[in-house]
Curated annotation (Swiss-Prot):
Designated name of the protein: Succinyl-diaminopimelate desuccinylase
Residues reported in the UniProt entry to bind Zn(2+) 2: D101, E136, H350
Reactions performed catalytically: N-succinyl-(2S,6S)-2,6-diaminopimelate + H2O = (2S,6S)-2,6-diaminopimelate + succinate
Keyword Metal-binding tagged: yes
Gene from which this protein is expressed: dapE
Cell wall biogenesis/degradation found in the keyword field: no
Pathway: Amino-acid biosynthesis; L-lysine biosynthesis via DAP pathway; LL-2,6-diaminopimelate from (S)-tetrahydrodipicolinate (succinylase route): step 3/3
HAMAP family: DapE
Organism: Aliivibrio salmonicida (strain LFI1238)
């Protein structure tokens, strides 16, 4: 049995070693298909990152498929059962780096749009693609830069599906209609270095910071809401000391991270942290990194269209969740866009032997096409 159009394109994309921020010709392959459909292509290169914006139509609403062609490194090749860049089907599963995250989705998007335009050449509104090779990297020169460019010329995305692997057990069982925000703090508590035998003429920043850190970990930041769990505070990194057993360190460095709901704000969290540190009379420096703001699409045409499309294909409505890490959807949501994530099962993403069910790719293609039918036919 010959490969389907979706599987053929997926294999072609997966055979290209596009480890972030490399694209390895994936975007060129997609652009060729989109040009044939009448899309206008705008390639946007920012430093080491290749992006493209493709649009068909000039009317509202503007619907966008967003995704990335880059993949994470393979890890140890000896741990893979197959070559990660030679897509291989075993027992109905397609194995390759990027199969689930997210070249499989890209193939589904392209084929769904080809089918939709074939059936509805004079469709309503506008179709577009926002594709980057920087999602798995530092996310500095990718989607966020394209969004800035679009905003500068007032080209605003109304609705967007991000092809991130949202599903858990089977394709479409979960769609993400929002994501938590991420805020990182880099705290340096200052002490006075000295000999451990003379603590009275030194000041131990580890000891000084312990009460404040404990209080930070015990604080209830908010209660969450119907869509988000309560905001969480975690300390992923701590560093202090010289390595010697007889030296009180001069500084203690603590990195902490909030994953926060729409019930909290960056400014509110920052203010509460500063007040707590000051209450404990710490001498410190504190730098902040806003990794992303929370977003939520709890109503609107896109949510309805996606839920109905999944129900049509699966005979069951999806669960709406906001769990997991951040995605490029956070940048697009800043435009005021409705944003939904719908993609393959995420059980093997970033792991060795990453894979996706071949049948799931066909179902996902049908879901994407049905969304377009619901919105723009």
């Amino acid at each position: 049995m010959p490969d389907t159009p979706t599987l053929t394109l997926a294999k072609d994309l997966l055979s290209r070693q596009s480890v972030t921020p490399e694209d390895a010709g994936c975007q060129e392959l997609m652009i060729k298909r989109l040009k044939a459909l009448g899309f206008t292509i705008e390639i946007m290169v920012f430093e080491d990152t290749t992006n493209f914006w493709a649009r068909r139509g000039t009317e509202a609403p503007l619907f966008t498929f967003a995704g990335h062609t880059d993949v994470v490194p393979t890890g140890s090749l000896t741990q893979w059962n197959t070559d990660p860049f030679e897509p291989t089907i075993i027992d109905g599963m397609l194995y390759a780096r990027g199969a689930a995250d997210m070249k499989g989705s890209l193939a589904c998007m392209i084929v769904a749009v080809e089918r939709f335009i074939s059936e509805h050449p004079e469709h309503k509104g506008s179709l577009s693609f926002l594709i980057t090779s920087d999602e798995e990297g530092p996310f500095i020169n990718g989607t966020t830069r394209v969004v800035d460019t679009l905003k500068e010329r007032n080209e605003i995305i109304d609705m967007c599906i991000v092809g991130e692997p949202s599903s858990t057990q089977y394709v479409g069982d979960v769609v993400k209609n929002g994501r938590r925000g991420s805020l990182t703090g880099n705290l340096t508590v200052k002490g006075i270095q000295g000999h451990v035998a003379y603590p009275h003429i030194a000041r131990n920043p580890i000891h000084q910071s312990m009460a404040a850190l404990l209080e930070l970990t015990m604080t209830e930041w908010d209660l969450g809401n119907a869509y988000f769990p309560p905001t969480s505070f975690q300390i992923p990194n701590m560093n202090s000391g010289t390595g010697a057993s007889n030296v009180i360190p001069g500084t203690a460095e603590i990195m902490f991270n909030f994953r926060f709901s729409t019930e909290s704000t960056v400014e509110g969290l920052q203010q509460r942290v500063i007040e707590l540190l000051d209450k404990h009379n710490l001498e410190y420096d504190l730098d902040w990194i806003i990794n992303g703001l929370p977003f939520l699409t709890d109503t609107g045409d896109l949510l309805t269209a996606v839920v109905d499309a999944v129900a049509t294909v699966n005979q069951q409505k999806p669960e709406l969740l906001t769990t997991g890490g951040t995605s490029d959807g956070r940048f697009i949501a800043q435009m005021g866009s409705q944003v939904i994530e719908l993609g393959p099962v995420n059980a093997t993403i970033h792991k060795v032997n990453e894979c996706v069910k071949v049948d799931d790719l066909e179902k996902l293609t049908d879901m994407y096409q049905e969304v377009l039918n619901n919105l723009l036919a």
